[in-house]
């Protein structure tokens, strides 16, 4: 199953029962990774991109328009230029290339790095996350607590193909 918040209850139970430092889950083709803290709390993609930005210190970061507005304020705090993009892989990658960005991310936990030629690579993201944990020696919840979790839900609305553009306008 997809590594969504709803599908991770077993992993959350294991993290709590075994007192794990954190948990991870990949999607089927390993281009997406989700993280859970030591309490089994799900970290959204914006929280993970916040951590990657804070500790890896990229100069330019591309993020989706669906990120909470506070995200751009943190980028300024970390002296990173934030570039907002349309939602979706193609838009993020194109925006990263056009702006020579170092890192990009989606709420859905797809992350992109210039170092990997903009490929979605969950394993590269995982190793960057491990590097952050090793260098900071703090619990994941401690590292993430500075970034406030604002209520945000996404939902799908079914519309006929011929009506989508009219509705968006």
PLM segments and residue spans:
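Short, acidic/small-residue loops that bind anionic groups at enzyme active sites
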Residues: 41-60, 86-87
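Short Gly/Thr/Asp-enriched flexible loops that form oxyanion-binding sites at enzyme active sites
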Residues: 31-49, 71-72
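Short, well-ordered alpha-helical scaffold segments within catalytic/effector domains
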Residues: 5-12, 46-50, 168
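Generic detector of well-ordered alpha-helical packing
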Residues: 26-32, 38, 65, 107, ...
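Generic hydrophobic alpha-helical segments
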Residues: 7-15, 53, 92, 96
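N-terminal small/polar loop signature for handling phosphorylated ligands or for N-terminal nucleophile
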Residues: 1-36
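Alpha-helix N-cap and loop-to-helix initiation/capping positions
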Residues: 2-6, 41-44, 121
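Phosphate-binding and adjacent anionic-ligand microenvironments
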Residues: 58-169
């Amino acid at each position: 199953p997809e590594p969504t918040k709803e599908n991770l209850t077993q992993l959350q139970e294991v993290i709590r029962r075994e007192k794990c430092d954190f948990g991870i889950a990949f999607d089927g083709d390993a281009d997406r990774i989700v993280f859970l803290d030591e309490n089994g709390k799900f970290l959204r993609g914006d929280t993970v991109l916040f951590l990657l930005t804070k500790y890896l210190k990229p100069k330019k970061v591309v993020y989706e328009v669906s990120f909470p507005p506070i995200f751009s304020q943190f980028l300024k705090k970390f002296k990173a230029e934030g570039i907002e993009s349309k939602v979706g892989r193609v838009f993020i990658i194109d925006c990263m290339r056009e702006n020579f960005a170092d890192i990009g991310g989606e709420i859905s936990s797809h992350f992109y790095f210039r170092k990997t030629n903009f490929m979605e690579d969950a394993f590269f993201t995982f190793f960057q996350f491990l590097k952050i944990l090793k260098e900071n020696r703090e619990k994941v919840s401690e590292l993430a607590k500075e970034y406030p979790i604002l209520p945000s839900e996404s939902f799908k609305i079914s519309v006929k193909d011929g009506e989508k553009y009219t509705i968006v306008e």
